[in-house]
Amino acid sequence: MKFLVVFASCVLAVSAGVTEMSAGSMSSSNKELEEKLYNSILTGDYDSAVRQSLEYENQGKGSIIQNVVNNLIIDKSRNTMEYCYKLWVGNGQHIVRKYFPYNFRLIMAGNFVKLIYRNYNLALKLGPTLDPANERLAYGDGKEKNSDLISWKFITLWENNRVYFKIHNTKYNQYLKLSSTTDCNTQDRVIFGTNTADTTREQWFLQPTKYENDVLFFIYNREYNDALKLGRIVDASGDRMAFGHDGEVAGLPDIFSWFVTPF
């Protein structure tokens, strides 16, 4: 009887050891797959990244995708946007919906959105007045939170392995554009709404970031690499003019980042 008890204990111990080894091996294997997917995205091999993601999802290994997406955002990787876009157009919309923050889906689907500057909690709009070139100045609205004045949508453009966006104001049917001239003191550039979008001054790219558990975006102009921001001066309506910022912003998400929320 004593022999049987000892034998049973040995069997249980061996089984437990095998289980632990199996779990450890699986964890190690998943970590390697995460690194492979992350590196494919960082090197711009998006077709491979999409193939891997579809395969992992079919195998029930979605946690790999989720961890990679989380790490990309924490690391402020611009390539997150390209990866998301290639999934969206490459039979991976279900992956975007399942593993990416909701605002990524809003952007890729071209849904109507609000762009809210985190620092001042003001929504981007175009002013009512046309200049001689039929352009309107862009502002952060000091009062409005819900009217179509602050309704925008992103229009995607893929070029040279990068995704860019035309940012379209649905109220005035104009596109966000960065001025070619700079302020003599700050070197910042004024931002307008314009009727056409046929140059890189009307194209923008996004860099995701995370701050205080919120997923936000830096919004950069393709032509000048200036980041979209709101100025410090408040006019009589409580509005602030929009500018392209001349300088580094990635280390200051609390000041220069934007919420993208449903309209």
From Swiss-Prot:
The keyword Cell membrane does not apply. It is found in: Secreted. The keyword Translocase does not apply. Pfam families: Lipoprotein_11. It comes from Bombyx mori. This lipoprotein belongs to the group of structurally related '30 kDa proteins' that comprise major protein components of the fifth (and last) instar larvae and of pupae. GO terms for cellular component: extracellular region. Residues 1-23 form the signal peptide. Keywords: Lipoprotein, Secreted, Signal. This is Low molecular mass lipoprotein 4.
